[in-house]
Amino acid sequence: HGRVFPKTDKSRTIIQALENKIQELGASILTNTEVVSVKKVDKQFQVKSSDQTFTSDKLIVTTGGKSYPSTGSTGFGHDIARHFKLHVTELEAAESPLLTDFPHKALQGISLDDVTLSYGKHKITHDLLFTHFGLSGPAALRLSSFVKGGEIAHLDFLPNQSQENLKTYFEENREKSVKNTLKALVPERVAEFLAEDKADSKVKQLRPKDLENIISQLKGMEIPITGKMSLAKSFVTKGGVDLKEINPKTLESKKVPHLHFA
């Protein structure tokens, strides 16, 4: 999930770099030209638009997935792959916000920095946002690649603190209210949510099991995942042309010579 940005911090710089390379190679750019079909006749590819036919010895398909259709993605690249009898794996939403039943209604609008959201062996430490439907922000988007719905995720509000350290912290602040003690660790509304009806009690008044429960919530709140947003509302399509059928060095199809996917 590493990201690289141009020095200008502007997407236009990337576009210009691609355009410059295309011009350097003597190629043409056709805009407002929708490809309607692709086939191979003898040893050449035929690419048809509504009013033109283009032929080439090689074909590179870079149509993107089926997510984020406002960018022009329709999944047509998968249709091309299927036409050439290539295997297309199941398509799923990835880099998608997560839908939950709990606790987003109580915490809606709260953003958290550098928390750890995990499911099984997958642990993502990044920023997180509670929304009216569930979870968003980088941590949720990245975890979405590993869930479908029906899983239990765990949220660690304080990944840099151990449970033992937190026990010591509460003991050192035993004369303070539970809410104020928690407020020094997490946003106020999260503190109120975790303290429940003991917000105004002093830490020393908590039963051992109540304190243990608060610390457990801080280190691993259970969040049932009910699903994720549709492909149309996701940033990335998980799945596509089976990589077993693609040469990793050239991105060429192993079944169809000179057909590349990128």
Predicted regions and their residues:
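Conserved N-terminal/central alpha/beta ligand/cofactor-binding core
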Residues: 1-28, 33
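A conserved short coil-to-beta-strand element within the FAD-binding core of flavoproteins
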Residues: 31-44
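A short alpha-helix-loop-beta-strand transition element characteristic
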Residues: 1-5, 26, 85-95
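A glycine-rich dinucleotide-binding beta-alpha-beta segment and adjacent secondary-structure elements
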Residues: 31, 192-262
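Short hydrophobic core segments
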Residues: 35, 54-73, 81-82, 128-133, ...
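An anion/pyrophosphate-binding glycine-rich loop and adjacent beta-alpha core
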Residues: 86-90, 96-209
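Flavin (FAD/FMN) cofactor-binding core of flavoprotein oxidoreductases
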Residues: 7-15, 94-103, 227-245
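Short loop/edge segments at beta-strand edges and connector loops
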Residues: 29-33, 49, 90-92
